[in-house]
Swiss-Prot record:
Family that this chain belongs to: Belongs to the con-10 family.
Descriptive protein name: Uncharacterized protein YmdF
Biased composition (Basic and acidic residues): 12-23, 36-45
Chain segments carrying region Disordered: 1-57
UniProt xrefs under InterPro entries: Stress-induced_KGG_rpt (IPR019626)
Gene: ymdF
Length: 57
């Protein structure tokens, strides 16, 4: 396991970089929820429902 390949894309060993990438991703997202809180709310609900496959409880 000492041979890590493609270090540039490995966030597991570089949490700070992963955090930066997350912030950048949020800023550059195509759908701007700042101007449309209603849409942001709907997206949140959809995301919660469709995550983790089957949870029909």
């Amino acid at each position: 396991m000492a041979n890590h390949r493609g270090g540039s894309g490995n966030f597991a060993e570089d949490r700070e970089r992963a955090s930066e990438a997350g912030k950048k991703g949020g800023q550059h997202s195509g759908g701007n929820f700042k101007n449309d809180p209603q849409r942001a709310s709907e997206a949140g609900k959809k995301g919660g429902k469709s995550s983790h496959g089957k949870s029909d409880n």
